C-alpha cells in the first residue's frame, strides 16, 4: 500500500533553485545584522547604552541639616513595611523605561515611568534636583514646610523634565500612560510621570500646577505650628501633591522591569484610624547621608 502513495519529486534544477534561495535569505539576514551593528541599532547595544545612561553616577548635595533649593537629592520611603529582613540597599524614587520606548530612546524622556527601586549608589535614574515652584531662582534658599517646589531630573538640559501627577478626567481615566497600575479599594490610584517644562503652563498640554509639591510634618498636630519652618533632611515627612492634595505613596506592588523587580509608586492617601499617615506616605529627602534619622 505504501508504494502506491504518490511522493513529491523535484527535478535537480528545482532543488538547486530552492537551495540558492535559502542561501540568499541567510545572506540577507547577515547583511541586515551587520548594518544594524554598524549603526549601533542592535537591541543588545541599545540595552547596554540604556544601562550606562541610567546608571551614570551622581554626586548628591553635601550633607546638611536642612533641604535647599537647587540641591540634588533622593526621595526615599522611610520603611517598606513588607518583610522583616533588613535590606542594605535603601529604596528610592526612580525612573524606568519600558520595552516599548527602549527601541527608539535610551535616555530619560517624557515617556519614562516612575517606580521605587533599590538604590545602591546615587545615579541619574534615582536622583532629582529641587527647584522653585514659582518660576523664581531660589537656589541655596532653605525649603520650608508648606512651600511649593518641583522635582527635576538631573539629566535635563535645555528642556527640563519635571515629575508630575494629574487628577482623573470626567471618565475616571488618567492622562498619564503607565504599564502597571495600583489600586485602593478597587479604584486605580493616580500615577506619576515625567513632562517637559515646555509642555507646562497656560494653554499647554499640562497645567504647571500638576508639577508642584510641598512637604508637611509627619505629626498632624504639629503641622500648623511647623508651617513655614525649614524642612530637615533625612527626616520622616509627608510629600503632598498640590492640585490633588494627595500624598506621594509607596505601593506594596512588585513589578518586573528592565532593571529587575521594583515597587510601584502613586499619589494616594493612606491613613490609620487616628488620621495619621501610614508607612506608604512617609518619606525622607536624602541629601547624601547613608542613613536617615529613623
Question: Language-model segments: which ranges?
Answer:
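Lectin-like carbohydrate-binding module/patch detector with strong preference for beta-trefoil
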Residues: 1-294
Amino acid at each position: 500500500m505504501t508504494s502506491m502513495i504518490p511522493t513529491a519529486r523535484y527535478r535537480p534544477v528545482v532543488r538547486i533553485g530552492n537551495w540558492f534561495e535559502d542561501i540568499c535569505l541567510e545572506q540577507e539576514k547577515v547583511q541586515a545584522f551587520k548594518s544594524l551593528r554598524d549603526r549601533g541599532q542592535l537591541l543588545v547595544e541599545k540595552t547596554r547604552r540604556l544601562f550606562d545612561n541610567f546608571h551614570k553616577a551622581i554626586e548628591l548635595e553635601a550633607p546638611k541639616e536642612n533641604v535647599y533649593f537647587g540641591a540634588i537629592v533622593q526621595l526615599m520611603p522611610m520603611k517598606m513595611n513588607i518583610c522583616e529582613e533588613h535590606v542594605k540597599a535603601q529604596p528610592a524614587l526612580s525612573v524606568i523605561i519600558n520595552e516599548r520606548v527602549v527601541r527608539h530612546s535610551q535616555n530619560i524622556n517624557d515617556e519614562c515611568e516612575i517606580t521605587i527601586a533599590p538604590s545602591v549608589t546615587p545615579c541619574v535614574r534615582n536622583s532629582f534636583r529641587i527647584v522653585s515652584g514659582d518660576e523664581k531662582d531660589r537656589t541655596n534658599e532653605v525649603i520650608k514646610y508648606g512651600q511649593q517646589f518641583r522635582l527635576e531630573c538631573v539629566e535635563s538640559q535645555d528642556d527640563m523634565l519635571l515629575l508630575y501627577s494629574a487628577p482623573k478626567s470626567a471618565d475616571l481615566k488618567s492622562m498619564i500612560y503607565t504599564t502597571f497600575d495600583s489600586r485602593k479599594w478597587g479604584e486605580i490610584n493616580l500615577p506619576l510621570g515625567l513632562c517637559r517644562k515646555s509642555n507646562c503652563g497656560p494653554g499647554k498640554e499640562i497645567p504647571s500646577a500638576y508639577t508642584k509639591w510641598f512637604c508637611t510634618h509627619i505629626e498632624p498636630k504639629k503641622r500648623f505650628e511647623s508651617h513655614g519652618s525649614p524642612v530637615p533632611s533625612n527626616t520622616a515627612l509627608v510629600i503632598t501633591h498640590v492640585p490633588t492634595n494627595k500624598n506621594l505613596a509607596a505601593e506594596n506592588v512588585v513589578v518586573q522591569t528592565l532593571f529587575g523587580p521594583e515597587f510601584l509608586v502613586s499619589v494616594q492617601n493612606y491613613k490609620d484610624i487616628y488620621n495619621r499617615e501610614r508607612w506608604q506616605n512617609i518619606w525622607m529627602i536624602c541629601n547624601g547621608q547613608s542613613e536617615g534619622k529613623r
